[in-house]
C-alpha cells in the first residue's frame, strides 16, 4: 500500500488449500484493492488534518477559541445533567505589547509560545484539561470534573511560573468554577463572563495570583454590571451566543 509516494503497509491475500493458485488477473485485482485502501487512508488523514487546523492555534499548537466553544458547551451540558464541576481559567499575558514594540513581533511570538508551553504543562496537572489560546495575548484552561480548589491551585502554579518567563511581565489570571458560590450557571456564556470579569479584576489590581469568582466579592458584581464605555474590554465576550 503506497501512500504519498512511500510504502505505508502491505496487503496480503490468501486462499484455502486446494483452491486454484492466483493468476495475473487476481494480482491486478489486489493491486487495485491496495490503491483503493491507500485512497481511503489518505482521505482520512486529510480530514484529520483539516479538523486539526480548524481547532488548533497555529502559533502555539494549543487549542483555539473554536475548540474551547465546542468543549465548553459539552461540559456545560454535563453540568446540567449531573452537576459536573466545570471550571474556566482565563489568562491575559502581561507585557506583550511592550515586547512587540521594543523587540519586534518575532520575539513577541516566542513569548506567546513560551507561555503556551507553561500553560500546557500546568494543564497536564488536571485530568482532561483543555489548554487554549483565545487570541492575541489571551489564553484559557478549561476543565470538567476536577474540584474548584484543584483548579485554583493549578492557576496559582501557572501565575508563579509565568512570573519568571524571560521578557514577560507575568499573567493576569481569573477563575470561574461551578464548584464555587457564583450562583446558577446555566450557560457557557455566563461562565465565560465570570472568568473574564475575574481576569479583568486581576489585571486592574496587578494581582500576583489568580482572582477567583465567588471568592472575590466584586467579581460577580463586575460580571453583571454593564460596560462603562464602548471601549470597555469586558465587551470582548459579552456578546457570545
Swiss-Prot record:
One of its GO terms (molecular function) is diguanylate cyclase activity. One of its GO terms (biological process) is cell adhesion involved in single-species biofilm formation. Disulfide bonds: none annotated. It comes from Streptomyces griseus. Residues 231-241 have a biased composition (Basic residues). GO terms for cellular component: plasma membrane. It holds the Pfam family GGDEF. SUPFAM superfamilies: GAF domain-like, Nucleotide cyclase. CDD domains: GGDEF. Residues 215-241 are annotated as: Disordered. Gene3D superfamilies: 3.30.70.270. NCBIfam families: GGDEF. This is Uncharacterized protein in hutH 5'region. Residues 84-216 form the GGDEF domain.
